[in-house]
Each structure stands twice: as C-alpha cells, then as structure tokens.
Amino acid sequence: MGQIVVGYDGSACGDAALESGLEIAKDLGDKVVVVFGYAPPGLWGGEIAEHEEAIEELGEKVMASARSHAAEHGVEIESELVPKRAAEALIEVASKRDARMIVVGSYGEPQLKGMILGSTPNKLLHLSERPVLVVPAANR
C-alpha cells in the first residue's frame, strides 16, 4: 500500500486537490495523508503564542473538513499540521512517508490575479523529488 500526500488549506483549489487525491487513493488502494503547512510566526512581539494558537485552530478546522470529505469517499486519512511553509511541509512529509506523489491545488488563499500557478505548487514542481499533481479548482 502506497501513500499519497495532499496539501489542503480549505480553499476551492484545496478541495479539488483533496477530491483528486482521494479518488486516486481509492483506485490504487493507497492511504491519504493530508498536510496543513503553516509558517511559524516570527519574533516580532508578545502575540506569538496567540497567533500560533489561532493558526493551529484553523488547521484543526481544515483537517475536520478534510476528514468529512474523505468519509464521503469511504477513504480513511491521516492528517499532519506542520509548522513550516506549505511546500517545505509537503516535501518533508512526502519524504518521511515515502509517498507515491504529492497532490495540491493550483492556488491557495488568496489567489493573485494573473498568476499561472500559486507559489506552493511552483516550488513543489521545482524542488520535489516526487511526482506532483497540480489540480485547478472545479469552478475555474
């Protein structure tokens, strides 16, 4: 049984990536590992703990949404909240778990108008040693 790592942030493109990752995993009999990567706060004041707590709370909500999507597909997932920028988090988890592939949406939140790809998929395509599937949002 292989593993597929999916980057998920709760955005429309994240939903599309999760759906694709779940479908591929179901077809291949693989396990899905959903990753929410977030940059840890810098050293700029006393609000660091509150900031980190809020981001982790958001990550837990995003993972609950991912588990709900997975249940609809009949696929069990594992989830990881990783305090690193998204691309770095995905590469680290994929390497640690010897993943078959990484699946991400073409944009996260917020989308910059006119960009061909968001920064996370762009970095993954250049830095990942594993195959990367970039999925556009369904409503694009």
Model features per residue range: what roles?
Residues G2-E47, E53, E78:
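Small/aliphatic-rich secondary-structure junction motif
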Residues D30-K31, V75, A99, R130:
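Short glycine/serine/threonine/alanine-rich loop segments
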Residues F36-Y38, G105-Y107, P136-A137:
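Short secondary-structure boundary segments
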Residues E50-K61:
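A short acidic, glycine-rich active-site loop
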Residues M101-H126:
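Glycine-rich, Arg-bearing micro-motifs that act as flexible, cationic patches
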